[in-house]
Structures are given as C-alpha cells and as structure tokens.
Curated annotation (Swiss-Prot):
Pfam families: DHDPS. InterPro entries: Aldolase_TIM (IPR013785), DapA-like (IPR002220), Dehydro-deoxyglucarate_dehyd (IPR017655). NCBIfam families: KdgD (TIGR03249), PRK03620.1 (NF002958). One of its GO terms (biological process) is D-glucarate catabolic process. The keyword Membrane does not apply. Keywords: Lyase. This is Probable 5-dehydro-4-deoxyglucarate dehydratase. It catalyses: 5-dehydro-4-deoxy-D-glucarate + H(+) = 2,5-dioxopentanoate + CO2 + H2O. It comes from the Bacteria. SMART domains: DHDPS. PANTHER family: 5-DEHYDRO-4-DEOXYGLUCARATE DEHYDRATASE 2-RELATED, DIHYDRODIPICOLINATE SYNTHASE.
Length: 313
C-alpha cells in the first residue's frame, strides 16, 4: 500500500516532469519483466516526478485486467520508493474499479482514470463513473479528460466535493477555452497535467494556464533531452524550447503521424534505437517499418552527444 496521501502524491507529480514507461513484451507478446525492471531502474536515475505504469504509452489498452496490477507490482518493487508510481485504469466502471483495487494492493501511489471504452455518456453518467472509481480506493486519482470522457468545470467541481481523493486533471484534448474555464473554476484544488500526444509541443502555452507538468513519452528513450526541455519550459527559455521542437520533436511527430497508432509504436522503436529493445507492440498496433526505423535512428543520433550517450548507458 502507498505511504503517500492523495494530496502528497498530487503535489509531487505537479513539481516536475512525468512519463509513461513502455511495457516490454517478449516475441510471444507476454510481459517481459526483466526488461521492464531494467528500464524502470534506468529511468529512476533521471529527474522525474512520477512514472505511470501501464498507462497509454505502456499499452494499457492491450493489457488484461489481471496484467495491469502485475505490471504495477513490478514497477513499485523496482523503483523502491524513489519516485511515485501511478497506474492506469479504465474501461467500464466495474472493470475500472477492479483494476483500481488491484493496483492499490500492488502498491500504486495513485491512478490515472482513462475514458470508458467506446461509450459516450452524459455528464451525470461520467461523474458517477469517476466517483465509483474514486470511492473504491484510498489513493489519489487523476481523471483523463479526452475523447469520449470530457468533464465540464461544474461536473469537476461536484466530483471534487464528493471525492477528496480526486486530485488531478489531465488534459488530452487541447481545448484552450475549456482548460481556462477548468482552472478558473478549480484553481489549486487540482494538479493539472498536459496530456496531448508529444506534449512538449504544447508545454509552454499550457504553463501559463496553470499546467505545471506534462507527460513526456520521449523520456523513455532520450531522458536527458526530455528533462532539459522541461527545465527550459519552466524557465521560459524560448530559444532552447524552439530549438528542441525544430530539431527533434517536430521531425519525430512527422514520422509518428504517418500511420495510426504510431504514438506508441514510435516510442518502442526509440527504445530499440538506443539499445534498450522492449519488444514489439501488441496487436492491433504495428511496429515501424525498416525505413522509418532508419529515419528515427538518424534523428536520435543527430541530438547533442550528451543526450544520446547518456540515453544509451
């Protein structure tokens, strides 16, 4: 069980960069625990405020409800309290509660509640879903606002009154007006996380709206670059930010956007580039082609030597 209160967890994750480690798979697509342990230990050597086990980049959507707590257990065991570990949960309410309870027992410090699977619902239904998950555990919960689960400010306010352990709001839609209204309504009651794909692209404008942190997928394979970029965002170092976007992030996005599902596939490909092969993505996702792998390799090698050499250690 976590030793952190929901409020302590929220304060911690709001203080620095966040990331979602990939979930390594063997050739037969089974969980590769040894590689996962090695990756988690390595990532803990960098300045990161929280790691999300079995999150979106960790292919939560392809893990079974039984696998998620197991992945979380390994993450908690390997990090040894060096960094908070949060777990993904989602699908329908019953399954989301089941995964949440299992993750809490496995030692997770918090939860990221992903949208219900393919279900569109009214605000009252979404609120009841979030409340049911929050009340099934004692650890802190972060709600992921995206796709078919977009909570409006008034709904969030009611939920925060009813659920003291609802402590975070992750934005995955990029609606500036909605984000402004949410922050104006809730203020410091919640910790705000930028959660758009390749969140570095939106990090600076979001900072001015109270979003002090974001989830960096590229931290998986170029952690030195990711942490330096985050530091530049916090300092509002426009020159460093725009150089990082131009030289690495935007070319990476160009490869990612070629095919559906590459937001995850390209991160696993990056792990392979730096010598930390974490296996294939699970179906229905597909891996990068040889040509795309070559392009990604060249992009990573073009980074400053310090970022590449430290990433490959």
């Amino acid at each position: 069980m976590s030793k952190m209160t929901p409020q302590e967890m929220a304060a911690k994750i709001g203080s620095g960069l966040l990331s979602f480690p990939v979930t390594p798979f063997k050739a037969d697509y089974s969980f590769d625990e040894a590689t996962y342990r090695a990756n988690m230990d390595w990532l803990c050597g960098y300045e990161v405020a929280g790691l999300f086990a079995a999150g979106g980049t960790g292919e939560f959507f392809s893990l079974t409800p039984a696998e998620v707590p197991e992945v979380v257990r390994v993450a908690v065991d390997e990090t040894r309290g060096r960094v908070p570990v949060l777990a993904g949960t989602g699908y329908g309410t019953a399954i989301a509660r089941e995964i949440a309870i299992g993750a809490e027992k496995a030692g997770a410090d918090g939860l990221l509640l992903l949208p219900p699977y393919l279900t569109h619902a009214e605000q009252d239904g979404l609120a009841a879903h979030v409340e049911a998950v929050c009340k099934s555990v004692k650890i802190g919960v972060i709600v992921y606002n995206r796709d078919n689960a977009i909570l409006q400010p008034d709904t969030l306010a009611r939920l925060c009154e009813r659920c003291p352990n609802l402590v975070g709001y992750k934005d995955g839609i990029g609606d500036i007006e909605l984000m402004t209204r949410v922050y104006s309504k809730m203020g410091d009651r919640l910790t705000y996380i930028g959660g758009l794909p390749t969140a570095e692209t939106f990090a600076l404008p979001y900072l001015d709206m109270g979003v002090t942190t974001y989830s960096s997928a590229v931290f998986n394979f170029v952690p030195e670059f990711a942490t330096n970029f985050y530091a530049a965002v916090r300092k509002r170092d426009h020159a460093t930010i725009h150089a990082g976007l131009k030289d690495f992030i935007l070319p990476l996005i160009a490869i990612r956007n070629r095919k559906k599902g590459y937001a995850v596939s390209i991160i696993k490909a990056g792990m392979k580039v730096i010598g930390r092969d974490s296996g294939p993505v699970r179906l229905p996702l597909t891996d990068l082609t040889e040509t795309e792998m070559a392009e990604l390799t060249a992009l990573v090698k073009a980074l400053p030597a310090a970022a590449v050499s430290q990433a490959a250690e």
